[in-house]
């Protein structure tokens, strides 16, 4: 079982990655938007009674930081690819930009697709044109993600589940990797 997990969040600017992290780690919602260049934090979580140190790496969605973003990918155990349900470009960019960047840097790391700002479906100027869950699940299948989740950092809906799923996904991936090592035959001798 992993004692520490590195979780990296990627996606376009202003899709709610930082708000999601702040809500999860401090149970507050940031009132003002502040673009992220690069930030990381950590929390201790428990899974099946075992304490795990969860490292959370918030990346810049802005293309101006494309060259330094891969530094945060090193040794990641799970990636959360985030888009806003109220921003079609952020949704399209998961397939057209983010998945290729992740796969070129982390070819074997599990990815979860996370729809953020789901409160916008109920209130807000974009509610009629918001991306629905069916479209999100289809995208997750198209990019071969391990799962699809929805959340709203503003209303604190689904936030806990996102990180529970991230931890469980990383742990399961590590177990599969260890099982393969255990059962792989490197050398065969006949006596």
UniProtKB/Swiss-Prot annotation:
Modified-residue entries (Cysteine methyl ester), positions: 188
Compartments, as annotated in UniProt: Cytoplasm; Cell membrane
Effector region (motif): residue ranges: 33-41
Family membership noted in the UniProt record: Belongs to the small GTPase superfamily. Rho family.
Pfam families: Ras
Tissue specificity of this protein: Expression is widespread in hematopoietic cells, including in bone marrow progenitor cells and in differentiated myeloid as well as lymphoid cells. Expressed at high levels in the thymus and mast cells, found in spleen and low-density bone marrow (LDBM) cells and is detected at a low level in neutrophils. In the thymus it is detected in thymocytes of the thymic cortex but not in non-lymphoid cells of fibrovascular and fibroadipose tissues. Expressed in T-cells, B-cells and mast cells.
Annotated source species: Mus musculus (Mouse)
Protein name: Rho-related GTP-binding protein RhoH
InterPro entries: P-loop_NTPase (IPR027417), Small_GTP-bd (IPR005225), Small_GTPase (IPR001806), Small_GTPase_Rho (IPR003578)
Propeptide intervals in chain numbering: 189-191
Disruption phenotype: Knockout mice have smaller thymuses than wild-type animals, and T-cell lymphopenia due to defects in T-cell maturation and population expansion in the thymus. Mice show impaired passive systemic anaphylaxis and histamine release upon challenge with the specific antigen.
GO cellular component, one term: plasma membrane
Organism domain of life: Eukaryota
Residues with lipidation of kind S-geranylgeranyl cysteine: 188
Domain notes per entry: The region involved in interaction with ZAP70 is a non-canonical immunoreceptor tyrosine-based activation motif (ITAM).
One MF annotation (Gene Ontology) recorded for this entry: kinase inhibitor activity
